[in-house]
Structure formats: structure tokens, C-alpha cells
Amino acid sequence: MHTDTTFDLWVLTGKHWREDLLNIAHIYFPQTKGRKVTLRLETTDQDGCPRFHTDRTHLRLLCTYLGPGTEWLRNDQANREAQLAGAPNSEILLADKPSQLGRFWVGLLKGSAFPGNSLNGLIHRSPPSQGPGVNRVLFCLDS
């Protein structure tokens, strides 16, 4: 992980960042089949969604520009019954460590509203907070 904050600030300013957001959106929008899309661009040093969950969306696009990326589980790592029952993460994660999106990676997550996917949305969570003042910048598109 690159820790030079000067580099981080350069990446997050100006023309290059705007172009990247637009390029990602242009790839995402055709996948939505004309559905309404909501956009979030957030900066936080807090825990977002600490519990492993699935989204009640069609498709969610995530890209972390600063800080740790979204954690996710393969189907063979997850106890879906525990997840649906609201059990704690320790009962949902069956084996290994969660996979994690890297910084600048684009994740396209099928939610439970995706056709034929009602009980098979990607199980994921926000990464644990790195502490006060250690920010995460996340771009999210939902349909």
C-alpha cells in the first residue's frame, strides 16, 4: 500500500480524478438497463457497514480511492443462513480471511434485486476503521 499522502492528494484532485469517475460511470450505466442510479462519494474515518451483508440492489459499483477497500466473501467462505438470520460476523465467515478490493479497483457487486439472484448477492462489508483521522474515500453507484 502506498502511504505517501502527497501522492494520495494528487490522485484525489483535479482532472485525473474527475476523468476516472466519469470513465467508471460510463462502464457502469449500460449494465443498469435503464434503472435509476444513485451516486455516493463519501469520505469517512468511521466504520461504515461493519457486518457482512448483501445489498438489496440490482448492481452496486464500488471504488475506494483512499484507505482500505471493501471486504467480501466467496460463497464457500460464507454461512448464508447465519447472514440472513442476522448472526455476528464470526458465524458468517466460515474459513480464511475475507478477500478485499484493492485501492482503485472497481468492484461490481450483484445484489439480491439482480434477476435470478435473490438469495445469492455478494456478501461483503466495509473494512474496519483504521482510526480517527485515517480517512477512506469511496465512490459508489447503485441501481
Question: Model features per residue range: what roles?
Answer:
Residues T13-R18, R35-L41, D47-G48, E81-G86, ...:
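Short linear motifs at secondary-structure transitions and domain/linker junctions
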Residues K36-T38, H58-L61, G67, R136-L138:
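Extracellular structured ligand-interaction cores
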